[in-house]
């Protein structure tokens, strides 16, 4: 609700709302997933097709909605920042992805949602590795939490990679993130479930033998707040005669 109220203030002031929905290109294709920002009143929405849809790396879309956004201005900035020699392979990949979703998207997402439901039920059987989720979340992202087990997210990440040859998206703190897509196969899901359950069983055995020291959930970590001496955008205003080349070895920061 607070987000909705905030959006209302934005609309009243006639401020264009830009949503970076890079990891949400699959939103809105099935009720199992969150709604697409284009359907929620956003003026500009950015989607990285390659992150969650079948498209080559570096393919993305920018959607312009409503009348608040100056399309000519957006095009001018794109001409300034984008290459003058675009890859036709990448553009063909975008067209292929859009055409696939237009023709077969409904069936693909129906199957995808059902496979994900089964996968999540299987993973929820673990005793120590937990599927983290909130009231509103994207079920296609598998956040594997090892909080309280004594294992770190990076340990889980590299164990899955080196021992089970499963490449996850990232790891940080006490969790690791696994990405899924409409073209994942049951064989891949089975490998993931088997690997996570085996690691979960190892955690159980280590816990009973006191080989791991549990990390308490909600433990606070103080983040240092360094003094801001100079902001990056201010560097452009420094005259050339005041600049000098400095080796990183002699740098303070």
Regions found by a protein language model. Give the residues of each.
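Active-site PLP attachment segment
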Residues: 38-76, 82-93
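Amphipathic alpha-helix from the class-I
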Residues: 92-107, 183-187
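A short helix->loop->beta-strand "cap" motif at the edges of active sites that frequently abuts
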Residues: 12-15, 42
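General beta-strand structural signal in soluble alpha/beta enzymes
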Residues: 17-21, 45-48, 54-55, 131-133, ...
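Conserved PLP-dependent catalytic core of the aminotransferase class-I/II
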Residues: 98, 102-134, 154
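Conserved PLP phosphate-binding loop immediately N-terminal to the Schiff-base lysine helix
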Residues: 5, 15-36
């Amino acid at each position: 609700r607070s987000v909705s109220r905030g959006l209302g203030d934005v609309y009243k002031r006639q401020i264009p709302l830009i949503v970076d929905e890079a990891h949400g290109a699959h939103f809105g294709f099935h009720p199992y997933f969150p709604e697409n920002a284009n359907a929620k009143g956003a003026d500009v929405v950015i989607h990285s097709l390659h992150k969650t849809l079948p498209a080559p790396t570096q393919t993305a879309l920018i959607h312009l909605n409503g009348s608040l956004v100056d399309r000519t201005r957006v095009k001018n900035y794109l001409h300034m920042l984008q290459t003058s020699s675009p890859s036709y392979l990448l553009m063909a990949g975008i067209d292929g992805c859009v055409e696939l979703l237009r023709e077969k998207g409904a069936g693909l997402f129906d199957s995808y949602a059902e496979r994900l439901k089964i996968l999540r039920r299987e993973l929820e059987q673990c005793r120590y590795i937990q599927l983290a989720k909130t009231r509103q979340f994207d079920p296609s992202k598998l956040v594997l939490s090892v909080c309280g087990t004594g294992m770190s997210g990076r340990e889980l990440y590299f164990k899955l990679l080196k021992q089970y040859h499963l490449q996850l998206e990232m790891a940080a703190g006490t969790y690791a993130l696994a990405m899924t897509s409409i073209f994942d196969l049951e064989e891949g899901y089975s490998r993931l479930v088997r690997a996570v359950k085996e690691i979960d069983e190892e955690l159980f055995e280590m816990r009973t033998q006191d080989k791991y020291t549990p990390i308490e959930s909600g433990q606070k970590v103080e983040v240092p707040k360094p003094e801001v001496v100079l902001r990056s955008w201010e560097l452009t205003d420094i005259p050339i005669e005041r600049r000098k080349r400095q080796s990183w070895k002699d740098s303070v920061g």
